[in-house]
């Protein structure tokens, strides 16, 4: 496979999978999920690779699903004659081959540990993807959240539920409030937050330590933990969440909102959504990620 929207780079025992649409905040487009799953499989099959690092190029990890153009780029999967088809949407989101969550979960299923490195914006589907990694380390000023809680979507990977206790899971599910990397670490959503200047070195240091452990040992420990969460109903929660997500993308309110994004602009739609809360697009500069914090492609960093 030739990668269009990700970058795959191996440095010794580490495989870097980098979301590579920096001009668009690495928002998710149809090829990205196929390429992600393929790259994870490539790292799994490479016996020299011990650890996978997932990151985003440019100013952000991932700005969520790309819905410019009214989400029509997904019509091949969810529409008939240009109109939303509930049956096709249901088939798409619940299929192991085409569903968004099963492709995110290639990170979870990988026998090799996955470290997700988060900076900038990590929202919506981008946060669902990030949290499927085993260990998540973020910059302190990263902004992580699920704005779809307010309009046009629903939890589908379940990680926001399983990583948090009931109180925070409910609060963030109902408000869609963004949390900084620092707060995400404090509430246990992610493992650690560090200043951006230390982020890449922090991730590399942990990856090198994990790479010193036999791969079979890591695989067995990961499998035991994963199985415990499967026993708690993770897969059924994901199936239910995916179906709910397909419905909530197509309520009258959601359709009016996505039409506003198509007719006026994505910026106008998210401003309407976020205005009462004063976050995401409407946050003050102090509550937004520093736009100067940029992650290069691994090959560029090594060359530099």
Protein language model regions, located:
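Crotonase-fold acyl-CoA enzyme core
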Residues: 6, 105-218
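Short, active-site-adjacent cap segments at secondary-structure transitions
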Residues: 59-63, 123, 225-228
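Terminal peptide-recognition signature
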Residues: 17, 21, 35-36, 54, ...
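Catalytic-core regions built around general acid/base machinery
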Residues: 35, 39, 99-111
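Conserved CoA-thioester-binding segment of acyl-CoA-metabolizing enzymes
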Residues: 1-57, 294-304
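C-terminal alpha-helix plus adjacent terminal tail
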Residues: 1-11, 73, 180-181, 212-304
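Glycine- (often His-adjacent) and acidic-residue-rich active-site loop
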Residues: 56-106, 265-266
């Amino acid at each position: 496979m030739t990668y269009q929207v990700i970058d795959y780079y191996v440095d010794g025992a580490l495989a870097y999978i980098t979301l590579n649409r920096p001009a668009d905040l690495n928002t998710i487009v149809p090829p990205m999920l196929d390429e992600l799953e393929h790259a994870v499989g490539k790292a799994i099959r490479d016996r020299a690779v011990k650890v996978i690092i997932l990151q985003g190029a440019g100013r952000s990890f991932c700005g969520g699903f790309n819905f410019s153009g009214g989400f029509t780029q997904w019509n091949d999967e969810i529409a008939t004659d240009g109109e939303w088809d509930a049956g096709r949407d249901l088939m798409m989101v619940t299929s192991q081959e085409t569903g968004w969550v099963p492709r995110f979960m290639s990170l979870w299923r990988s026998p090799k540990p996955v470290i997700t490195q988060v900076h900038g914006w990590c929202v919506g589907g981008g946060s669902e993807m990030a949290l499927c990694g085993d260990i998540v380390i973020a910059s302190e000023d990263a902004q992580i959240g699920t704005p779809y809680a307010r309009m046009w979507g629903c939890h589908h990977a379940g990680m926001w539920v399983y990583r948090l206790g009931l109180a925070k899971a409910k609060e963030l599910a109902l408000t869609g409030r963004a949390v900084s990397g620092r707060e995400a670490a404090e509430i246990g959503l992610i493992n650690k937050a560090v200043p951006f200047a230390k982020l890449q070195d922090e991730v590399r240091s942990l990856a090198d330590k994990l790479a010193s452990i036999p791969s079979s040992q890591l695989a067995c420990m990961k499998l035991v933990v994963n199985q415990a969460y499967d026993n708690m109903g993770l897969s059924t929660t994901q199936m239910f969440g995916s179906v709910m997500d397909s419905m909530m993308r197509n309520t009258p309110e959601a359709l009016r909102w996505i039409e506003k994004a198509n007719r006026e602009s994505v910026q106008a739609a998210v401003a309407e959504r976020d205005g009462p809360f004063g976050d995401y697009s409407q946050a003050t500069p102090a509550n937004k990620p520093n736009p100067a914090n940029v992650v290069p492609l691994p090959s560029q960093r090594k060359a530099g």
